[in-house]
Every structure is written in structure tokens, then in C-alpha cells.
């Protein structure tokens, strides 16, 4: 019995460490064009917000507007290079397809509904950089809420 409890404790510790590690990652850092877009915008990885900071909304209160805009420009650059965005316009269908491929979400999945809501919320924004960061922040926040609600279930 003690061994079983120890295994459960270790599993919980590993799961917590993994979630913490993911939240410390920089937004967009897992994508191919990350370094290219950083260079194109004259930024370093230190300039980019962490996933945890963005999913919790702390990026809005902890940073100046220029930092928000620069992070958004890097996000827009990656979205554009991946064919998901052209200027300030989304390719909504391609964005859904890529999101499903990346997350493994199935039809009816609340994550897809969240993505759709985030695209709808930001679609009329004209500044491509601000629009991109707000979209990414919206999706990350929704994923965090959905993850929390599924853990509590």
C-alpha cells in the first residue's frame, strides 16, 4: 500500500512539474518560425512573454503597451509564415484545421468552440500585432480554464 501511495505521489509531482515547465515556456517557442520572427522584429527570447503569464492575463498588467505590441508582432509573424494569417486577416478554416491537428481536438470539443469565440472576438481588430496577441491570449486563457474545470471534474 505504501508503494502505491508513493507512486501516486510521484505521478502527481511529475504532472505538476510538467505543467509548471509548460507555463514557463515562451509563447510560440514550439513553432518552426519562432527564431526567424524574433530576429525579424529585433527581439530576443527574454522579450517574449511566458505561456503562464499570458494564460493568466498577467502580461496585460506587468508590461508596457510597446512590449505587448512587440510580442503580438512576433505572434502575427509566425501565424503569417504558417499561412494562418495574411496581414490582419485570419484564414479561419486553416486556423481550425491546424488547431485540431495540433491539439487532437474532436468535433464538439470545447477547445474548438473557444478558438471560434476568440477568432470572433478579435476578427474586427485592425492592428495585426495587437489582434494576434489578443487571439493567442484568449485561446491560452480558455485552454487554462478548460483544463482547470476538467481536473476538478
Swiss-Prot record:
> Is Transport a UniProt keyword of this protein?
yes
Where does it localize?
Answer: Secreted
Gene3D superfamilies registered for this protein in UniProt:
Pheromone/general odorant binding protein domain
SUPFAM superfamilies given in the database record: Insect pheromone/odorant-binding proteins
| Superkingdom of the organism of origin | Eukaryota
State if Transport is listed as a keyword.
Answer: yes
Q: Where is the signal peptide?
A: 1-19
Q: What is its main location?
A: secreted
The entry lists its GO molecular-function terms as: pheromone binding
Q: Alphabetically, which GO biological process terms does the record hold? A: response to pheromone; social behavior
Question: Any S-S bridges, and between which cysteines?
Answer: 37-77, 73-129, 118-138
Recorded GO cellular component terms are:
extracellular space
Annotated InterPro entries? PBP/GOBP (IPR006170), PBP_GOBP_sf (IPR036728), Pheromone-bd_protein_Gp-9 (IPR022354)
Sorted UniProt keywords = Behavior, Disulfide bond, Pheromone response, Pheromone-binding, Secreted, Signal, Transport
Quaternary structure annotation from Swiss-Prot or TrEMBL: Homodimer.
Q: What does this protein do?
A: Colony queen number, a major feature of social organization, is associated with worker genotype for Gp-9. Colonies are headed by either a single reproductive queen (monogyne form) or multiple queens (polygyne form). Differences in worker Gp-9 genotypes between social forms may cause differences in workers' abilities to recognize queens and regulate their numbers.
Q: Which family does it belong to?
A: Belongs to the PBP/GOBP family.
Q: What is this protein called?
A: Pheromone-binding protein Gp-9
Organism equals Solenopsis tridens (Fire ant)
Amino acid at each position: 500500500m505504501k508503494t502505491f501511495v508513493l507512486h501516486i505521489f510521484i505521478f502527481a509531482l511529475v504532472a505538476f512539474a510538467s505543467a509548471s515547465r509548460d507555463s514557463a515556456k515562451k509563447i510560440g517557442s514550439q513553432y518552426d518560425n519562432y527564431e526567424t520572427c524574433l530576429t525579424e522584429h529585433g527581439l530576443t527570447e527574454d522579450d517574449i512573454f511566458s505561456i503562464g503569464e499570458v494564460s493568466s492575463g498577467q502580461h496585460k498588467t506587468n508590461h508596457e503597451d510597446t512590449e505587448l505590441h512587440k510580442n503580438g508582432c512576433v505572434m502575427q509573424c509566425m501565424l503569417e509564415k504558417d499561412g494562418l494569417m495574411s496581414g490582419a486577416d485570419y484564414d479561419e478554416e486553416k486556423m481550425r484545421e491546424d488547431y485540431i491537428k495540433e491539439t487532437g481536438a474532436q468535433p464538439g470539443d470545447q477547445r474548438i468552440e473557444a478558438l471560434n469565440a476568440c477568432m470572433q472576438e478579435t476578427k474586427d481588430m485592425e492592428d495585426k500585432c495587437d489582434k494576434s496577441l489578443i487571439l493567442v491570449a484568449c485561446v491560452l486563457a480558455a485552454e487554462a480554464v478548460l483544463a482547470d474545470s476538467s481536473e476538478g471534474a
